[in-house]
From Swiss-Prot:
One of its GO terms (molecular function) is structural constituent of ribosome. It comes from the Bacteria. Part of the 50S ribosomal subunit; part of the 5S rRNA/L5/L18/L25 subcomplex. Contacts the 5S and 23S rRNAs. CDD domains: Ribosomal_L18_L5e. The gene is rplR. This is Large ribosomal subunit protein uL18. The lineage of its organism: Bacteria, Pseudomonadati, Spirochaetota, Spirochaetia, Brachyspirales. GO terms for cellular component: cytoplasm; ribonucleoprotein complex; ribosome. This is one of the proteins that bind and probably mediate the attachment of the 5S RNA into the large ribosomal subunit, where it forms part of the central protuberance. Belongs to the universal ribosomal protein uL18 family. GO terms for biological process: translation.
Amino acid sequence: MGLREKIKAQRERRKRSIRIKIEGSSERPRLTVHKSLKYVSAQIIDDSKGITLASASSQEKDLKSGKNVDIAKEIGKVLATRAKEKNISEVVFDRNGYIYHGKIKSLADGAREAGLKF
């Protein structure tokens, strides 16, 4: 097993253990984050119905330019405003196996600044 596969396997293990403890409901949906080397995206998901309630991504036209950490913070703010439009004020944060640092932390801080509670 190469280094890349080992890191991916470790993240998948963390992701599984987190998902056992976290489940989104209609009252408190799950805010999940996905990042690649180039993009960051986040979704608010109602696990009981299996639907996405709101989403934001760095691939959107108005969020494309800037540094990754700054863009992640803007994504958090945009996602929080879209959630407020759908009367969602509280969520459960799912870091999806990623370390709570850098882009992930910045996205969470941006969502908190815009009024989302978790």
